[in-house]
Amino acid sequence: MRRFVLDTSVFTNPHCAVQFGEDPLAGVQTFLHLARRCPAEFYMPLSVYDEFRRMRDLAEMAADFETDVWVRSPRRFSMTIPAEILYEFIHELRGRIDRGLRIAEEHTRQAGAATDMRPELIASLRERYREAMRKGLVDSREDVDAVLLAMELDAELVSADEGMRKLGNRMGVKLLTADYLRQVMENLGAGH
């Protein structure tokens, strides 16, 4: 039986969530309907589930969600990961910090040349800094929990997050493109 570890992006990233419907909560209902008919197991770490519940009001369907999706954390204290992963992470983080500083310096020079601080200059700094620092990098405990749980369960990680997919790939975790989840569920259900 296939196992899938879900990230919030399945339900919150507009490009992924639309596969289950236009309305976010109806989309979760559609996912649950498909999950019940699919010969697979679905998991979500507690930290990711808590984050998801802060993003979406699941009050009326929380019990249904927890019926179809196992909510559990990885066994962090008994798992090991290769030291090379940590070395690569530190190397990448150092490079990103340097890029972020260069962007901040560039915008500071532009601001110094301006007679007043334009709001679009601040917005540009914020966007470029975020891109340099976060895009393609695991940047939260929730992200790490999902990757570790997929590794522990030998499950497929379902996420649109580039950083999670990149780390999962480095660690040998099976990956499923989040945009394809509904079709994969339907394919599995049709064969059952």
UniProtKB/Swiss-Prot annotation:
It comes from the Bacteria. The keyword ATP-binding does not apply. Keywords: Endonuclease, Hydrolase, Nuclease, tRNA processing. CDD domains: PIN_VapC-like. Pfam families: PIN_5. It catalyses: Endonucleolytic cleavage of RNA, removing 5'-extranucleotides from tRNA precursor. GO terms for molecular function: ribonuclease P activity. GO terms for biological process: tRNA 5'-leader removal. Its EC number is 3.1.26.5. InterPro entries: RNA_free_RNase_P. PANTHER family: RNA-FREE RIBONUCLEASE P, UPF0278 PROTEIN TK1425. RNA-free RNase P that catalyzes the removal of the 5'-leader sequence from pre-tRNA to produce the mature 5'-terminus. Belongs to the HARP family. This is RNA-free ribonuclease P. It comes from Alkalilimnicola ehrlichii (strain ATCC BAA-1101 / DSM 17681 / MLHE-1).
